[in-house]
Amino acid sequence: MTQISERFLVQAHLDAKQPRTLSPAEQARYRADIAAELKKQDAVLVAHYYCDPVIQALAEETGGCVADSLEMARFSNNHAASTVLVAGVRFMGETAKILNPEKRVFMPTLEATCSLDVGCPVDEFSAFCDQHPERTVVVYANTSAAVKARADWVVTSGCALEIVESLMDNGEKIIWAPDKHLGRYIQRETGADMLLWDGACIVHEEFKSKQLEDMKALYPEAAILVHPESPEAVIELADVVGSTSQMIAAAQRLPNKTFIVATDRGIFYKMQQLCPDKIFIEAPTAGNGAACRSCAHCPWMAMNTLERTLQCLREGSNEIFVDPALIPHAVRPLQRMLDFTQAARLRQAGNA
């Protein structure tokens, strides 16, 4: 694992712990109390697909949003609520605040970070960019507000290919950060001239190609869905490579009844909701004596619990603040992404 110490990974697991098992009655009480607090505080709950199913269900029940990071950003930007509660990891809360500086933004915990974010410190990244001033800086959404402020473009896995293709068509050379696997995939698909930062996601980097081949042999009729943050050897085995939303769409679209899925298992909630007659299997994250650390579930996403969500609302704790001096610089590449994807949607609608 690059730039992330073993101690940090172990501590992340210790901090996450396993959520206390709640009885059905306790869950119902927490959900009712959270719904009441959201209404009372003019707040909306926005949850990522990788959160635990109970959090995703709560977001849906209360008129919020369950989505990938791009749609979370768009939803927070467009929703009328004065307060946004982001169930996800810290960069998602920061993104909501950057796009909505006038709103109050909270998270169930501020400890929920991301290995990609931590693996791209702004000082080191800025120095890297300064060595290549002729290049356009494109960063993945999984980065800090400070890194976004240093960038020309922010992208998500759902729009990265199209944006890089557009930049390449304009003759631009690119610095890409932080996920090396996603960067390599984009580079291979587009042929763009890209310098890659050396970061990786602790969940997706654990998927194993040899074990995936063995699993495919057990389920020969299964389609393999792979997130592009996965290693290249895993991507090569995929029937579909895409963002969380793109994988969900593929599960709905493809005729296969069984799917092997190489991403965080939190996505199964939405897949099973939309495709109740289909079977979804976790891609293997261990084998040949190797043990998994994340085991197909982000330890930081797991920190978003019902108890922490209610505590956050009642106490007004875990509010997200972003340096006001950074916001004008960080909002520019984010707004470019939103404008680009909105224009692409309109073009697609016009061609429908």
UniProtKB/Swiss-Prot annotation:
Segments traversing the membrane: none
Protein name: Quinolinate synthase
Organism whose genome encodes this protein: Pseudomonas syringae pv. syringae (strain B728a)
GO molecular function: 4 iron, 4 sulfur cluster binding; metal ion binding; quinolinate synthetase A activity
Coiled coil (UniProt feature): none
Annotated compartments: Cytoplasm
UniProt cross-references to Gene3D superfamilies, sorted A to Z: NadA-like (3.40.50.10800)
Protein task: Catalyzes the condensation of iminoaspartate with dihydroxyacetone phosphate to form quinolinate.
Positions that bind iminosuccinate: H48, S69, Y140, A141, N142, S157, H227, P228, E229, T244
Gene Ontology CC terms: cytosol
Main localization of the protein described in the UniProt heading: cytoplasm
Lineage: superkingdom: Bacteria
Reactions it catalyzes: iminosuccinate + dihydroxyacetone phosphate = quinolinate + phosphate + 2 H2O + H(+)
Co-factor(s): [4Fe-4S] cluster
Entry-linked Pfam families: NadA
GO BP: any one term: 'de novo' NAD biosynthetic process from L-aspartate
